[in-house]
C-alpha cells in the first residue's frame, strides 16, 4: 500500500505496519481506544506495559505529554540529535489513556525523522503508536514481505524501507536519565 492508503487506514482506526529507523512498527491512531485495543490484542501485549508514540515533532505529542513538568534543559535533551534512535519516558497528561501509559503516570515518546513516519503523521495529523511488527516469539520484521508472512497478505503495510539503525531504540527517562533499554 502507498502512504495515502495507509494514512486512510489509520484514520479508519485500523492497525498498520510501517517502516521505522530499524524495523517495521505496528501502529494506529493513539487517540482511538478501539484502535489501540486492536493493536494490543494483535501483539498479545499486556496493557500494563504501555506503548511508545513516534512523530517527527513535539507538536504531535501535545495531546499526551504534560510539557509543564518538563524544564528547558530536559526539553533540549528531548529535542537533541543522537547517534541512535532514542525513546524518552516523559510525564503524561492525566487525561492520557491508560491504554497508552500502561500502569505508569508517564508515556514513552520518540522523535523520529524516518520519511515514512514523518509522512504518515503529516497526512493524518496525529502521532503513531509504535511497537515492533512481530508476533510473539518471532523476530521483528525488517521488510514489508516479512510483515505479510507474519500477519497475512492482506495486512495493511507501507511498502517502504527501514532506516539503517541496527538495534531498537534506546529508552531513557527524561527526568532521571535512567537507561531502561540499551539501543
From Swiss-Prot:
It holds the Pfam family Sua5_yciO_yrdC. It is found in: Cytoplasm. GO terms for cellular component: cytoplasm. It catalyses: L-threonine + hydrogencarbonate + ATP = L-threonylcarbamoyladenylate + diphosphate + H2O. Its EC number is 2.7.7.87. The keyword Nucleotidyltransferase applies. Keywords: ATP-binding, Cytoplasm, Nucleotide-binding, Nucleotidyltransferase, Transferase, tRNA processing. InterPro entries: DHBP_synth_RibB-like_a/b_dom (IPR017945), Sua5-like_dom (IPR006070), TC-AMP_synthase (IPR023535), TC-AMP_synthase_SUA5 (IPR050156). GO terms for molecular function: ATP binding; double-stranded RNA binding; L-threonylcarbamoyladenylate synthase; tRNA binding. PROSITE patterns: YRDC (PS51163). One of its GO terms (biological process) is tRNA threonylcarbamoyladenosine modification. Residues 1-183 form the YrdC-like domain. HAMAP family: TsaC. Required for the formation of a threonylcarbamoyl group on adenosine at position 37 (t(6)A37) in tRNAs that read codons beginning with adenine. Catalyzes the conversion of L-threonine, HCO(3)(-)/CO(2) and ATP to give threonylcarbamoyl-AMP (TC-AMP) as the acyladenylate intermediate, with the release of diphosphate. Belongs to the SUA5 family. TsaC subfamily. This is Threonylcarbamoyl-AMP synthase. It comes from Haemophilus influenzae (strain 86-028NP).
